[in-house]
Design a protein with these regions (language model features):
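Radical SAM/AdoMet-radical enzyme domain recognition
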Residues: 90-111, 117-240, 245-248
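Flexible mid-to-C-terminal extensions adjoining Fe-S/redox cofactors in radical SAM and related proteins
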Residues: 21, 29, 40-55, 323-324, ...
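Short, small/polar residue-rich loop motifs at catalytic or cofactor-binding pockets
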Residues: 309-313
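A structural motif corresponding to the C-terminal lobe/cap of the Radical SAM core domain
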Residues: 221-222, 226, 241-268, 305, ...
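N-terminal pre-core extensions flanking Radical SAM catalytic domains
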Residues: 4-84, 98-101, 295, 342
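C-terminal accessory region of radical SAM enzymes
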Residues: 196, 249-298, 323-375
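Cysteine-centered iron-sulfur cluster-binding motifs in ferredoxin-type domains/subunits
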Residues: 62-70, 114, 365-372
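Short, acidic, Ser/Thr-enriched surface-loop or helix-capping motifs
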Residues: 318-319
Length: 407
């Protein structure tokens, strides 16, 4: 709804859900304005997320760094044998769950590495469920069996995510550095469907497989996934070794535009670009071009955010060493659960407080009218520039302020 209008100064304040916008009227306003055509006549000045409660809504939890695959993009450089990062004990897992549950009730995704390599993974999930946490599981799928499906259901796991990076074994297995990985993922999807276990598919893309995006999307639908997340690589961990394979900013923009059109027409599969916060800018820009208001659907066990980068704002990662990180791709600790409570870290970490203060953002991101609904990928800025408050390096948008000033 329109919360305020002042046509004399040509300023409009707009509020839609949790997101607010400040716009000015562009040229050619010559018809009666209403909520359906307003977008076509406005030029953005700034966007913000209104009434934000910085509560932890979604936590990834690296319960092991061990993995049976050797993926080229792995954020944690996982391997079957990992030196210096042993699994924490079951007792420590219980302590962490008690700590989290005493403060919040987020979605908790048991991740890795490959979480199915931990013998107590289902005991951890069941305990988390008993504490009122919504437990999910992220697996590469290669270790899924009928018995695993039974254990998933018994533990009360709400959602499982699978990794699928190509529409064929040639592409996926190359990305995962393991022959047979594709067949394992497809088999896992089949077993989940047979056992009525809801699952989503995560797909990571670089130059080596970006031509597969449309095919993987269609395959995710065919497999019966609940949702499909298109991940744009953040070069951390082993991903640093494939920096030259990152999708170019120009191709990135084209893919986000394609995703917008696809999402508008998609009424079966929930879809979302991930680690692509500027998609929220693209949605607003395209909606304005189309002269329509685009309402996006949300997955029940998603991050719960109405904006782009949520690192340290609504989401976080707890790694196997009990460090609390802003997100899965942001290798900078905000604190350690062996030294502080989760509540203390979440509320008082200087790192998290920085990420929540958009006025501290630098470069084009700091000047951008979309900073409040995009924010740029803070992990990518940190990985590429070394400054987590720096400019998103893979966004080509020229902010309104900079365009007006000619800088």
């Amino acid at each position: 709804c329109l919360s305020s209008r002042n046509f004399g100064t040509k300023i409009v304040l707009w509020r839609s859900g949790r997101v607010g916008y400040t716009w000015k009227f562009g040229k050619g306003v010559n018809e009666r304005l209403n909520s359906s055509n307003l977008y076509r006549f406005l030029e953005p000045i700034t966007c913000w997320e209104a009434d934000v409660d910085f509560e932890p809504k979604w936590l990834a939890w690296e319960i092991t760094r061990r993995c049976n695959l050797n993926c080229v993009h792995c954020r944690s450089s996982s391997a079957l044998e990992v030196e210096g990062h042993p699994d924490f004990s079951h007792e420590e897992a219980i302590r962490i769950l008690d700590d989290i549950a005493s403060y919040a009730q987020p979605v908790v995704v048991l991740s890795g590495g490959e979480p199915l390599l931990r013998e107590d993974v289902f005991d951890i999930a069941a305990y988390g469920r008993e504490k009122g946490l919504r437990m999910c599981l992220a697996t590469n799928g290669t270790l899924v069996t009928p018995e695993v499906c039974s254990r998933i259901k018994e533990a009360g796991i709400k959602m499982v995510s699978l990794s699928l990076d190509g529409s064929s074994s040639a592409v996926h297995d190359d990305f995962r550095s393991q022959p047979g990985a594709f067949d394992g993922t497809i088999n896992a999807a089949r077993l989940f469907k047979e056992n009525s276990i809801p699952f989503l598919i995560n797909s990571s893309f670089t130059k080596r497989n970006q031509e597969e995006i449309h095919k993987v999307y269609r395959l995710a639908k065919e497999l019966g996934a609940t949702a499909w997340y298109m991940f744009m690589i953040v070069p951390t961990g082993r991903g640093e070794e494939i920096m030259a394979e990152l999708i170019s900013p120009e191709d990135y923009e084209e893919l986000l535009a394609w995703h917008y059109q696809m999402e508008k027409e998609e009424d079966e599969l929930l879809v979302r670009p991930t680690c692509a916060p500027h998609y929220y800018r693209v949605v607003l820009q395209k909606a304005k071009e189309d002269g329509e208001k685009f309402e996006r659907r949300s997955l029940q066990f998603s991050t719960g955010g109405a904006k782009g980068c949520l690192a340290g704002q609504l989401i976080a990662l707890i790694d196997v060493d009990e460090n609390v990180l802003p997100c899965s791709y942001f290798p900078k600790s905000a604190g350690n659960l062996r030294e502080q409570s989760f509540k203390e870290i979440w509320e008082n970490s200087p790192l998290f407080l920085d990420l929540r203060d958009y006025k501290k953002y630098k470069g084009a991101c700091g000047a951008c009218e979309y900073v409040g609904v995009c924010g740029g990928c803070r992990a990518r800025a940190y990985a590429v520039t070394g400054d987590y408050l720096g400019q998103e390096p893979f966004c080509g948008h020229v902010p309104f302020k900079l365009a007006q000033s000619g800088k």
